[in-house]
Regions:
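Accessory terminal regions of nucleic-acid processing enzymes
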Residues: 1-310
């Protein structure tokens, strides 16, 4: 591998722009369909777009701030000395593959990926498990670096530090490289988007792309007639299953009667009373229009409906 660019004093916008030039570790799981928070459809649009999306949130901020601490704990647990990479790296054999490493391990052909984990997600790290999209990220780093192994140190808030060692598997890396290069060649280069996969992140991406409707335009969807039929079939099945599910819940309620809680092998059931206050918006609009307008926000969205014409 080679250093593509130093990240010391590199503005974040420039760093994000460099990442558009190839496939990075965080792209790998999305391209493989393993990332629950990001999809191949989103990766594609990020790569072809000139827009630099500087997305940040509290979880990402904490992950950055605690990276030093996780690396320090890893060194304490293992005795390995680590150092910052301070660069975007590029595979010399497969130049499309780029990587930002959290840490490199001194004196070894190995690296370290630092993670912070909510205790609510601790089960995903139990019994030696690693979330699939993180494993794909590490395999990508192994493909770029040519190293022998990679470590993942995951700090589960308030509980423990979990350390895993991932050893290079040449067949796994070969398959990953093939998938990543196929994605780039078949989609990014010809600018042909991959099909969305039904995840919420793809819905958000599509809604963002087409925020405003054209009331004077009607699209011909004849080519999608088969898909629309399939959707209708699925809708009918879901409706039937929802009714069956509700009928079971009704039987459970009849058995519970006035009991707030119920138990069965492997299940805990609750049926408890609660009270809530809701604003009568219609009355407020009528009797206090100034106050209603003062605390009202205009929200723009496109409502999507499909009606089956028998």
């Amino acid at each position: 591998m080679k250093r593509l660019v130093s990240t010391l004093n590199l503005p974040k916008e420039d760093w994000l722009r460099y990442r558009k030039c190839g496939i990075t570790g965080t792209d790998a799981g999305a391209i493989l369909g393993l990332n629950p928070y990001r999809s191949a459809f989103q990766v594609y649009h990020d790569k072809i777009s000139d827009t630099i999306e500087n997305i940040d949130n509290e979880a990402m901020r904490q992950g950055r701030d605690l990276e030093d601490y996780v690396a320090q704990r890893f060194s304490e647990e293992t005795g390995f000395k680590v150092r910052r990479a301070n660069a975007i790296y590029q595979s010399e054999e497969h130049p499309l593959l780029l990587a930002d490493f959290d840490r490199l391990i001194v004196g070894q052909k190995a690296g370290l990926e630092c993670k912070t984990v909510s205790p609510f997600s601790a089960d995903k790290w139990a019994d030696g498990k690693i979330p699939a999209h993180y494993l794909a990220q590490v395999d990508h780093y192994l493909a770029v670096s040519g190293f022998d192994c990679w470590y993942v140190a995951a700090l589960i808030f308030g509980r423990e530090l979990v350390i895993h060692k991932i050893v290079t598997d040449k067949q796994v890396l070969s398959d990953l490289i093939d998938e990543e290069e196929r994605f780039w060649t078949n989609h990014v280069v010809p600018q042909i988007p991959p099909a969305p996969n039904g995840c919420e992140c793809d819905t958000q991406q599509i809604n963002q792309m087409y925020e405003v409707d054209n009331r004077d335009k009607t699209a011909d969807l004849s080519a999608l007639h088969g898909l629309l039929d399939k959707r209708q079939e699925l809708s009918d099945q879901i409706e039937q299953m929802e009714q069956e599910k509700t009928a079971i819940e009704q039987q459970v309620k009849l058995q519970m009667q006035d009991a707030a809680y119920g138990t069965a092998p492997g299940y805990k059931v609750s049926w408890v009373s609660s009270e809530s206050k809701r604003v009568d918006s219609q009355r407020l609009r009528k009797e206090q229009p100034d106050i209603f307008n003062q605390y009202s926000n205009n929200v723009s969205s496109r409502r999507f409906t499909i009606i089956h014409a028998a």
